[in-house]
């Protein structure tokens, strides 16, 4: 072999020796990287399965709320029903293993039972429905559902009745108008009649005014009384003033029969004679 061939062979062996450890290191590193990824993926999957695990449903040691409420109402035996507080107290004394939200749940169940018709609410108390009410409730529901189907016929009948009623009202109004005219004539006649009453009242007033003038003539007797008794003068004067005041106060509109009043002069003369 020549020297050139020997040198080429040596360089090839050196290159292969240098390349061998690099490839081994690369091969060793790659599996390590793959192993880390698989570990992370497994950990995430395990966490997800733990979180997604369904919670076990806790079985309550007490019966349903409906049964407990009915039992409380039956045992309490109140005539007007049992209040929420009484039912709550009874259940708490009888059942010791109750949840912390028992009172809220009791109120919700009471409302639900009242809405469904299993309980009857009277003011602030609850009681069981009577047997007659239970029997009548299905019948009432059936009756309500039956007329609901026959609504179109009833609507047509009501429309026809409304038209007939409107026509009859129009006829009545036409017939009533002549009556109103006749009534107006009658009222006008009635208003014209009371005129003679006013004339009669005027004549009575004139007669009343004329009578006192005729009675005021005997003034001579008053003069004789003045001479005999000076103390009686003041009494007669006061009486005259009183009679004048009463005459002024009498209203003109009222027609009053004249009273037979003696004049003060005559009274004085009668007292002197006594």
UniProtKB/Swiss-Prot annotation:
Ranges of Basic and acidic residues composition bias in the record: 40-49
Protein's GO biological process: nucleosome assembly
SMART domains: H15
One term of GO molecular function: DNA binding
Disordered: annotated segments: 1-63, 129-155, 167-233, 249-274
Entries under Pfam families matching the protein: Linker_histone
Listed InterPro entries: H1/H5 (IPR005819), Histone_H1/H5_H15 (IPR005818), WH-like_DNA-bd_sf (IPR036388), WH_DNA-bd_sf (IPR036390)
Compartment(s): Nucleus; Chromosome
Reported function: Histones H1 are necessary for the condensation of nucleosome chains into higher-order structures.
Family per similarity comment: Belongs to the histone H1/H5 family.
Protein name: Histone H1.1
Organismal lineage: Eukaryota, Viridiplantae, Streptophyta, Embryophyta, Tracheophyta
């Amino acid at each position: 072999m020549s020297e050139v061939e020997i040198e080429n062979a040596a360089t090839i062996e050196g290159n292969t020796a240098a390349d061998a450890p690099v490839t081994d290191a690369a091969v060793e590193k790659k599996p390590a990287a793959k192993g880390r990824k698989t570990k992370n993926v497994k950990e995430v999957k395990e966490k997800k399965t733990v979180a997604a695990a369904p919670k076990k449903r806790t079985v309550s040691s007490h019966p349903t709320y409906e049964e407990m409420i009915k039992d409380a109402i039956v045992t309490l035996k109140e005539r007007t029903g049992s209040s929420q507080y009484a039912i709550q107290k009874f259940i708490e004394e009888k059942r010791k293993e109750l949840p912390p939200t028992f009172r809220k749940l009791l109120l919700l169940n009471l409302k639900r039972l009242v809405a469904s018709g299993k309980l009857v609410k009277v003011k602030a108390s609850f009681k069981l429905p009577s047997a007659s009410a239970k029997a009548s409730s299905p019948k009432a529901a059936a009756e309500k559902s039956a007329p609901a189907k026959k609504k179109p016929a009833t609507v047509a009948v009501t429309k026809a009745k409304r038209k007939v009623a409107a026509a009859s009202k129009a006829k009545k109004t036409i017939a009533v108008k002549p009556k109103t005219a006749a009534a107006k004539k009658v009222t006008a006649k009635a208003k014209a009649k009371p005129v003679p009453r006013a004339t009669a009242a005027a004549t009575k007033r004139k007669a009343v005014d004329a009578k006192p003038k005729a009675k005021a003539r005997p003034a001579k007797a008053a003069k004789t009384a003045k001479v005999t008794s000076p103390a009686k003068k003041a009494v007669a004067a006061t009486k005259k003033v009183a009679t004048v005041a009463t005459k002024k106060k009498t209203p003109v509109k009222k027609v009053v029969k004249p009273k037979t009043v003696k004049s003060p002069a005559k009274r004085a003369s009668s007292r002197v004679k006594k």
